[in-house]
């Protein structure tokens, strides 16, 4: 029953995250315009990081309210592989499809809600710049990189929640910017599926190969390396006193 509750929470938070994250570009452009930062090369990157920081902060609260809900199946798999998750293989198998359904619902909803003039400025249509094989390699590397950074920040990073959240936002934006030269990097199979569903490419081999197999591979390999570098402390069993 707890696995089903987790899956439902994941579906809800992924639905909401897709709607919000689809507008990051619009939010960044609006803020740049409002503060008069046109022509300043670093402004969009800094503002994007702040937008993501605020968004992650809000969704951390929402996730806690929903009982630890998550919008990234690769994250769930990585924490399980690293040995720091209460998930089982069964719960992971339930949560991942729920996140994909939530992402598809969010993508459909935002495309219906957004005014026509903004539709070309939102969304996340998967884009392979150099073919499926190169896209798969880049997605493995990007997923590996961002997963290791996330594990490092959350498990070995600063204790202050705001500091953790800011570093997560910085890592996410940095990896996304680097990866945009090769694919539209998702590092999140559920969200990739949601937008692929909009563009009718969700049931293709290239989509499954690049955005599911490769993303999971990168995340799991990263978690395995993290577990080797930072092994969990051994459990110390207390000796029972003799009566």
From Swiss-Prot:
Pfam families registered for this protein in UniProt: MIP
Family per similarity comment: Belongs to the MIP/aquaporin (TC 1.A.8) family. SIP (TC 1.A.8.10) subfamily.
Alphabetized UniProt keyword annotations: Endoplasmic reticulum, Membrane, Repeat, Transmembrane, Transmembrane helix, Transport
Keyword rRNA-binding: no
Function: Water channel required to facilitate the transport of water across cell membrane.
UniProt-recorded name of the protein: Probable aquaporin SIP1-2
Bilayer disposition of the protein: Multi-pass membrane protein
Motif NPA 2: where in chain: 188-190
SUPFAM superfamilies assigned: Aquaporin-like
An example molecular function term from Gene Ontology annotations: water channel activity
Compartmental location: Endoplasmic reticulum membrane
Record-level GO cellular component terms: endoplasmic reticulum; endoplasmic reticulum membrane
Organism: Arabidopsis thaliana (Mouse-ear cress)
Gene name in the database record: SIP1-2
Keyword Transmembrane helix attributed: yes
Record comment regarding domains: Aquaporins contain two tandem repeats each containing three membrane-spanning domains and a pore-forming loop with the signature motif Asn-Pro-Ala/Cys (NPA).
């Amino acid at each position: 029953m707890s696995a089903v509750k987790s899956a439902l929470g994941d579906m809800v938070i992924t639905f909401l995250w897709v709607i919000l994250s689809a507008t990051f570009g619009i939010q960044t452009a609006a803020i740049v315009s409002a503060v008069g930062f046109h022509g300043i090369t670093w402004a969009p990157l800094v503002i994007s990081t702040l937008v993501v920081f605020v968004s992650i902060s809000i969704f951390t609260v929402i996730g806690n309210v929903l009982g630890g809900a998550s919008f990234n199946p690769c994250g769930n798999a990585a924490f399980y592989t690293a040995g720091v998750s209460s998930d089982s293989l069964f719960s992971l198998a339930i949560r991942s499809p729920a996140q994909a359904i939530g992402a598809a619902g969010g993508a459909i909803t935002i495309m219906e809600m957004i005014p026509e003039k903004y539709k070309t400025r939102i969304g996340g249509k998967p884009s392979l710049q150099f073919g499926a094989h190169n896209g798969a390699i880049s997605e493995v590397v990007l997923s590996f990189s961002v997963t290791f950074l996330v594990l490092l920040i959350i498990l070995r990073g600063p204790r202050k929640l705001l500091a953790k959240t800011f570093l997560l936002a910085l890592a996410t934006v940095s990896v996304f910017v680097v990866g945009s030269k090769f694919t539209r990097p998702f590092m999140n199979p559920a969200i990739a599926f949601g937008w692929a569903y909009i563009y009718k490419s969700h049931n293709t081999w290239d989509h499954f190969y690049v955005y599911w197999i490769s993303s999971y591979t990168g995340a799991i390999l990263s978690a395995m390396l993290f577990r080797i570098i930072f092994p969990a402390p051994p459990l110390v069993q207390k000796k029972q006193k003799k009566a």
